Design a protein with these regions (language model features):
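Short glycine/proline- and aromatic-enriched beta-strand/turn motifs that initiate or cap beta-hairpins
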Residues: 1-34, 39-43, 159, 163-168
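C-terminal/domain-terminus segments
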Residues: 140-167
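Short, surface-exposed tryptophan/glycine-enriched loops
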Residues: 126
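Gram-negative (and chloroplast) outer-membrane scaffold detector with strong preference
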Residues: 29-105, 119-121, 129-135, 165-168
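Extracytoplasmic loops and strand-loop junctions of Gram-negative outer membrane beta-barrel proteins
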Residues: 9-13, 52-53, 105-111, 145
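Transmembrane beta-strands of outer-membrane beta-barrel proteins
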Residues: 1-6, 43-45, 84-88, 140-142
Length: 168
């Protein structure tokens, strides 16, 4: 399990609205060691950018992505630095409430909900730290590139992950 935080900016929407700010999320990874230095597996994450600063509270931009990963790692004592990439797919969900009240059950007229699938390429670099026989703490940084037919999807930006994994 890994928790993450990062910064997203930019927007692909017809409203000239540029969502930006801190994003937070959770996800996980499973890896299979194929050699002394090469691993493959899969990972998946949710990341949410709350937009209550610019829009009505409850507005958000969510990213979900998952895919197949491959990474190259080294062992240096109890440290396992690695670098690799994940290739897969995901969905961006944008909910923009430009005016109104998110705490009532009344219909809001100036609200937008949009979902956009994307092809995901996610290069990353990180380090696992062995703290026991089967437990490792991990720190990782990435930059998710969400690609659609029209080009690179936004918002995008870096994320830092902290978490733990079990190893054999």
């Amino acid at each position: 399990m890994m928790l993450h935080s990062g910064y997203q900016s930019g927007g692909d929407n017809p409203y000239n609205y540029n969502p930006k700010g801190a994003t937070f999320g959770i996800g996980g990874v499973a890896r299979l060691h194929l050699s002394d230095h090469f691993r493959t597996g899969f990972e998946g994450y949710f990341s949410t950018l709350g937009l209550k600063k610019d829009l009505v509270k409850g507005s958000h931009n969510k990213l979900f992505w998952t895919g197949i990963l491959a990474d190259w790692y080294w062992k240096a004592g109890r440290f396992y630095p690695y670098m690799g990439a994940t290739v897969g797919g995901g969905m961006e969900t944008a909910y923009y409430m430009f005016e109104g009240n998110s705490h009532d059950w009344l219909p809001e007229t100036n609200t937008v909900f949009n979902k956009q699938p994307f092809f995901a390429v996610d290069p990353f670099i990180g380090c696992d730290i062995a703290v026991g026989e089967a437990l490792r703490l991990t720190v990782k940084a990435d930059w998710l590139m969400a690609i659609r037919k029209t080009g690179l999807n936004r918002p995008h930006g870096p994320r830092i992950y902290f978490g733990f994994i079990f190893a054999h």
